[in-house]
UniProtKB/Swiss-Prot annotation:
It is an enzyme of class 3 (hydrolase). Mg(2+) 1 binds at residues 107, 126, 128. Disulfide bonds: none annotated. NCBIfam families: PRK09293.1-4. It comes from Brucella ovis (strain ATCC 25840 / 63/290 / NCTC 10512). CDD domains: FBPase. This is Fructose-1,6-bisphosphatase class 1. Its main location: cytoplasm. It catalyses: beta-D-fructose 1,6-bisphosphate + H2O = beta-D-fructose 6-phosphate + phosphate.
Length: 340
């Protein structure tokens, strides 16, 4: 018996059978105009979206063609690499080189990959954030940052020199959040047309939140100040904060970012006493920087606990950093505890 057939998709009340919202490609074309750096930026983003469309097709097939989570090596920091990590890296590098970028820094390669000698932009990318969730139906994503390639080391510039940044969240829909410095825009992939269509513009975070995203299992390893922050929040309305807090933790920075950008919240992944976590765990150049760029464009903040992420000058390509981002008021409150 055939359980699944070639059926038309479910249509809900109020649904339209046509997607008429502007495509991201059309938006980027209008934004870029005839400016050479903007055109290079637009082409890089289009290449990433093309790769995302191809990658999600493989993600959706799960274990059918083979094990996407098969271990095949280690990256520069000795993190285990899965088959899908390497495949997604190769995919995005190929597309970005074809798009004419000057160089690509990927989590899955020790050194930047050279592109077009006279390219105007450089792209830092984590091809598949949260790959530990592969095959589990949990969040996965791609996150990227675009810098001007007008200096010898484009990836060792502070984040405030970013031209654009964004992420693609592979969930029950394929969603894009990005900014070219003119506010945060959301878009969703239409699987019929293969195009990302804009769904929201000028996204802003709320002024207050009671949602926290962090790994509670490591609380005992946090500094005294950070433990006090967590304890005070968990005391709820009977504690010094005077209100109850909820906890959300998706185990992938892109997943938590996407939720917070829509619902508000505070994410933190800071340094702690465990070996290898003394400086935090997320990568500054291609994780913390794009998140901080989007946070700023959404009227919120991102710090390493005390310093704005966008002001930090990286010393190495794969430098790690503590990261706190989300609703500005809560970032400031956490910062007061962080320095205790």
């Amino acid at each position: 018996m055939t359980l699944v057939g070639n059926f038309s998709p479910l249509v809900l009340v109020g649904d339209s059978d046509r997607v008429e919202a502007e495509t991201v490609g059309a938006y980027l074309d209008g934004w870029a105009g005839h400016d050479k750096v903007r055109l290079a930026t637009a082409n890089a983003i289009k290449a990433i979206l093309s790769g995302a469309g191809r990658l999600v097709g493989r993600i959706a097939r799960g274990y059918l063609p083979g094990d996407p989570g098969k271990l095949v090596g280690v990256n520069s920091d000795q993190d285990q690499q899965k088959s899908i990590d390497v495949g997604s890296h190769n995919l995005f590098v190929e597309l970005l080189i074809a798009a004419g970028v000057a160089s690509i820094l990927s989590e899955e390669a020790d050194l930047p990959v050279a592109g077009k000698a006279d390219g105007l932009v450089a792209v830092a990318i984590d091809p598949l954030d949260g790959s530990g969730n592969v095959g589990l139906g949990a969040p996965l994503g791609t996150i990227f940052s675009i810098f001007p390639a007008d200096v010898e080391e484009p990836f060792l510039q502070p984040g405030n020199r970013q031209i654009a940044a964004g992420y693609v969240s592979y969930g029950n829909s394929v969603d894009l959040g990005f900014s070219v410095g003119e506010g945060v825009i959301f878009a969703t992939l239409d699987p019929v047309s293969g195009q990302f269509h804009i769904t929201r513009r000028n996204v802003k975070l709320p002024e207050r939140t009671s949602d926290l995203a962090f790994n509670a299992s490591v609380q005992r390893h946090l500094s005294a100040g950070m433990q006090a922050y967590v304890n005070d929040a968990f005391l709820g309305k009977d504690g010094p904060r005077g209100r109850n807090f909820n906890m959300r933790w998706l185990g992938a920075a892109v997943g938590d970012m996407h939720r917070i950008m829509q619902r508000g919240g505070l994410f933190f992944y800071v340094n702690d006493s465990r070996p290898g976590y003394e400086k935090g765990r997320l990568r500054l150049v291609y994780e913390a920087n794009p998140i901080a760029f989007l946070a700023r464009e959404a009227g919120s903040k991102a710090t390493d606990g005390s310093r704005p992420i966008l002001d930090i000058v990286p010393q190495t390509y794969h430098e790690r950093s503590a990261l706190v981002f989300g609703v500005a008021e809560e970032v400031d409150i956490l910062g007061e505890y962080f320095v205790k």
